[in-house]
Structures are given as structure tokens and as C-alpha cells.
Amino acid sequence: MSAQGKEGNYIMEQLLYLVPVIGILGLLFAFFLTCTIKKQQAGNDRMKEIASYIHEGAQAFLMAEYRILVIFVVVFFLILGIALKSWMTAAAFLMGALFSSVSGYCGMQVATKANVRTAGAAKDSGMKQALSVAFSGGSVMGMCVTGLGLLGISLVYLVTKDAGI
């Protein structure tokens, strides 16, 4: 391999350490957006009451979904570990399922908070403010998925040095 090729590989290896940092930055941005959303007015008492029912329903849905998901994930984890004889691959799957679940949970928490605040902003401040709150709420889920995805994939690679997992 030429000197330039070795230098290129070295640079790529160093850049790989930036990926988890970018993932963490994405999660910090999601946290910032969440704080911004929570500062918005949640509307009048009736709006807050309806929002609490929506939040309660969303929580019930997530818990029912996660009960089924846990069974699937455990069974598939075992199938991967046994069939592929690669517990590292199975562990990477498990970590991905966990990170995905955390993303879904965070997204649902923020979505239920953003919904009532979007309605309140539309009522009190107009469409521009309502859209800002709504887009911020949706962005939290996207940033959580992206941030945790980058963090998970990069950590698996940095620990194993195996892109084939």
C-alpha cells in the first residue's frame, strides 16, 4: 500500500471517532428542543385535561407494544445467537432494539407535550408559532433516532472493529 493509502486509512480511522460525538450532539439537540417545547404554554385547563388523556392513552399503547416487543426481541436475540453462532451480532441486535425503543419512548413523550402546546400556540399566537412548536416536536423523534442510531452503530464498530456484525 502506498504512503498516501496508509495516510487515508489513518484519517478514516480517526474520523470514525467523530461519529459517536455527532450522535451525542444530535441527542443534545433533541434535549434542547424538548426544553424549548416545555417552555411553551400548554393552553387552558380544558386543553390540559384533554392532553392528559391523550398522554395516558399513548403511555398505555407504548406499554402494550413494548410487552410484545420484548418477547420478540428476546426470541430473535436467541435465534441470532444460536443460528449464527455469533453472540456479538445478537448483542448488536439487542442494543439496536433497545435504542429504537428509547427513541420511540422519547418521541412519544415529547409528541404528547408538543400537541397541546401546538394547539395553544395556534389559538394564542397564530400559525407561525404553532408550526414552530409542531416541527420542533417532530424533530425530537428524528434527532433521537439519528443520534442513538449513530451512537449505537459507531460504538459496536469501535468495540469490535468488525463492520460485518
Where are the regions that the model predicts?
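Hydrophobic packing and interface segments
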Residues: 3-165
